[in-house]
Amino acid sequence: MINDIRRINITTSSIESLNENSKYLKRNHKRTIKICAYAITTFALFFIVVVYFKNQTNVNDANRNTLAAIDETSLMNKEIAYLREILKKYKTKTNENNEYAYEKNDDINGDGEDEHELLLMLHKFLKNKGNPNKIDRFDINNNDSNKNRGNENIDQINILSQKLESMHDNIKYASKFFKYMKEYNKKYKNIDEQLVRFENFKTNYMKVKKHNEMVGKNGITYVQKVNQFSDFSKEELDSYFKKLLPIPHNLKTKHVVPLKTHLDDNKIKPKEGVLDYPEQRDYREWNILLPPKDQGMCGSCWAFASVGNYEALFAKKYSILPISFSEQQVVDCSSDNFGCDGGHPFLSFLYFLNNGVCFGDNYEYKAHDDFFCLSYRCAYRSKLKKIGNAYPYELIMSLNEVGPITVNVGVSDEFVLYSGGIFDGTCASELNHSVLLVGYGKVKRSLVFEDSHTNVDSNLIKNYKENIKDSDDDYLYYWIIRNSWSSTWGEGGYIRIKRNKLGDDVFCGIGIDVFFPIL
């Protein structure tokens, strides 16, 4: 042990060298710690900086989006504010010509709920109409958008300008549309359907206005107005007026009695000529007609015409006030007809012949088909003996010797919009509607709107008289027809249609299909 110790030669210089090495190792250790600390600090600072700038970018984007949203909201608010201002101004316009009730907005005034709905509907309408492709808003991060931003902004300004220019007219039509909805109790599923109906209404309204400006010119002797069909499209109207069912020849041969045979059987001697009969005949003055009924959205005109004919002749025969009989019974129970999908008055009379018809109170009208025939409800059934018919040249004779008769007509868009006067417009080429012929007459052209049943605006009558020429003040001949579209349509539910002096010109198809019940 001692020898080993002796082998170690320890000097002062060796000890100093060892001390230096120890210090060097300590310094390296501290340097490593510092480097690690600096690295960690640098990484932390870098991370903080990255996070900061990322957050700042998100904040900028959010602010930009917020500003854009605020800009869009401001634009919408400006539009709505403009609409409100126009609505207020429009309400004060009371000096415009009043073609009919929709020129004034009294019902809209003060109705906050309706005004809000009006603005909502119109705002959506204007956005869809003025910008159908939904032009995207300007995006500052989109290079393509940046490149064309000037053009896009100009386009958007032009679009907005066009919107603002058309707002006055649209707010005017929209306010009329809301009054129309109230009057006819129109209910729509959603705002999209309401917009479609608004467009249909606006089209028909402009058509009516254009027609009424021409009344008195070019021989036009009737006026139009919007009614329960004015929110229909042309396709819907064509679908509503269905072609009348054909009559099997064998049934017609078996059950129909010609007019002259019927008169001979009842020992009635008719006049020798049509001109021997009175110049006027109006069964509205005889107290044998009920007020015009309303078939609604059911294609049951054939039932209303035939039942109305039966009611009138029943009252005339027994000299009593008219009693209402059941259209719904015929709609549900007449298997030869197709209910609300169409029929024919002859087939309706054939049902009366075999089964009778009950009072309306026992079998009330629903304006739709029932799955079952509920004729057990009928406490009393009145039958007829035979079915009569007449030729076109016998219409005036029929009205005088029999009474009201059922005829079929060809209804057109112009016919539907009729409001008053003597209709001389275009008719459909096919018979598609059944009505009750209740009289005929004649009138001087200048006095067309002086009829007691006419309720035409005085301004229209004034314009009509200014437009006709004194040299053209001849006599006009017409039929009086009761429709089944309620008493709000036409002249209290009636229409006057032009005819020639003898009544055999079959205008609008009147005279082609003529039937009446023989009690």
Swiss-Prot record:
Q: Where in the cell is it found?
A: Membrane
Q: List the disulfide bonds.
A: C298-C340, C333-C373, C358-C378, C427-C508
Question: What are the catalytic residues?
Answer: C301, H433, N483
Q: According to its record, what are the GO cellular component terms?
A: membrane
**How does this protein sit in the membrane?**
Single-pass type II membrane protein
The record places the following residue ranges in the Cytoplasmic compartment, namely 1-32
What Enzyme Commission number(s) appear in the record?
3.4.22.-
One Gene Ontology term of the molecular function aspect: cysteine-type peptidase activity
Q: Which CDD domains match?
A: Peptidase_C1A
What's one Pfam family here? Peptidase_C1
Question: Which coarse location class applies to the principal site listed for this UniProt protein?
Answer: membrane
Q: Where are the transmembrane segments?
A: 33-53
The record's keywords, sorted A to Z, are: Disulfide bond, Glycoprotein, Hydrolase, Membrane, Protease, Signal-anchor, Thiol protease, Transmembrane, Transmembrane helix, Zymogen
Consequence of gene loss (knockout): During mosquito A.stephensi infection, number of oocysts and salivary gland sporozoites, and sporozoite gliding motility are normal. However, development of blood stage parasitemia is delayed in C57BL/6 and Swiss Webster mice intravenously injected with knockout sporozoites. Parasitemia initially increases but then plateaus for a few days to rise again more rapidly and mice die between days 14 and 19 post-infection with high parasitemia. Preferentially infects host reticulocytes.
Glycosylated residues (UniProt): N55, N143, N432
Please give the superkingdom of this protein's source. Eukaryota
Q: Which residues lie on this side of the membrane: Lumenal?
A: 54-519
Q: Which InterPro entries match?
A: Papain-like_cys_pep_sf, Pept_asp_AS, Pept_cys_AS, Pept_his_AS, Peptidase_C1A, Peptidase_C1A_C, Peptidase_C1A_papain-like, Prot_inhib_I29
Please give the function described in this protein's UniProt entry. Cysteine protease. Required for host hepatocyte-derived merozoite infectivity and to a lesser extent for host erythrocyte-derived merozoite infectivity.
Protein name, UniProt field:
Berghepain-1
